[in-house]
């Protein structure tokens, strides 16, 4: 009887200790890229701005959390999360089965297919054979990179640290095409003066294996139970109160909300 009593006391103490150690998430460090307009970029004064920057602020307001933005190259965001340099990632990160083996995600907060962009005065046959030996620029660590490498094996897929670097080589003629997020490229390049003479080529790509069900807030698996609910509630609240639509309409002429 005495042994059982001590066992119960030990279990209660362990549970209390675990509860005490669980973060209350009043302070959250958010990993962002800062080089993916119009979702996330740095203005001339060195301040972060964009759709996801505003969205992150709105989520933090809903959660009543004090949030800090931490800028990081896209391919370094998951390592930064695992190294506890950030608590979550808000950086147009697609929810895929492959990524879910490493990290956890919130519900999707926006969605956009992948598309090719090339010169409007050039002709492209968007097929495996048709793009043989063509140079395709992609951002390193993205689903677009993996899709291009797996699908267009006869093409020359060139990876870059940022999408802006891809655009520079596309404009200079060192690349034939880029494969990227349709919304980001439309608003951040095609509609800008720098994108004059460029447009979408071929169909939209939505293969769930690569492009998932949308973009979600990335977090460590160990934090999923406490943190995912907070973000899911904030995502749902912004959809319900019109906050998401207000930001959507500020940046885009089309609806980027996830279709779920």
Task: Describe the residue ranges of each PLM region.
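Short helix-initiation/N-cap motifs at beta->coil->alpha
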Residues: 53, 69-79, 123-124, 158-172, ...
